Amino acid sequence: MAAGMKGKRSRRRKERKNVEHGCAHIKSTFNNSIVTITDSVGNTLSWASAGGLGFRGSRKSTPFAAQMAAETAAKAAMEHGLKSIEVYVKGPGSGREAAIRSLQAAGLEVTLIKDVTPIPHNGCRPPKRRRV
């Protein structure tokens, strides 16, 4: 091993992209919410999840956790010059509306809201019914 390279890792500096319009992909499941903000081509600008922000267990699936995740992702994306977004929502979770409201409150102009939840045409067998 080289003498001066012990314990140092080379990290590329994040370059600041200038993007005015992008897409926000909100995946809201029963257990977690993930918000990814991309440019119009699909390259990721920023992302955040409820679990990544420190929410654990049943608090991860709350609308407040989704709101905080969307707010964090929006602030990071606005550093790249983002002003308006199209929102694509996927999944049955409780954080869908809260995340959209949070993106608007962060100062992003929402131009489109589209539900892209995948619907099976009688595909996989669903999990068994819960008995409580």
From Swiss-Prot:
Q: Name one GO molecular function term.
A: rRNA binding
Keyword tags = Ribonucleoprotein, Ribosomal protein, RNA-binding, rRNA-binding
Segments for region (Disordered): 1-20
InterPro entries in UniProt: Ribosomal_uS11, Ribosomal_uS11_bac-type, Ribosomal_uS11_CS, Ribosomal_uS11_sf
S-S pairs: none
Q: Name one GO biological process term.
A: translation
Write down any Gene Ontology CC term: ribonucleoprotein complex
Compositionally biased region (Basic residues) = 1-16
Whom does it interact with, and what assembly results?
Part of the 30S ribosomal subunit. Interacts with proteins S7 and S18. Binds to IF-3.
Q: Main role?
A: Located on the platform of the 30S subunit, it bridges several disparate RNA helices of the 16S rRNA. Forms part of the Shine-Dalgarno cleft in the 70S ribosome.
Q: Which family does it belong to?
A: Belongs to the universal ribosomal protein uS11 family.
> What name is this protein filed under?
Small ribosomal subunit protein uS11
Species annotation: Clostridium botulinum (strain ATCC 19397 / Type A)
Gene, per the UniProt record = rpsK
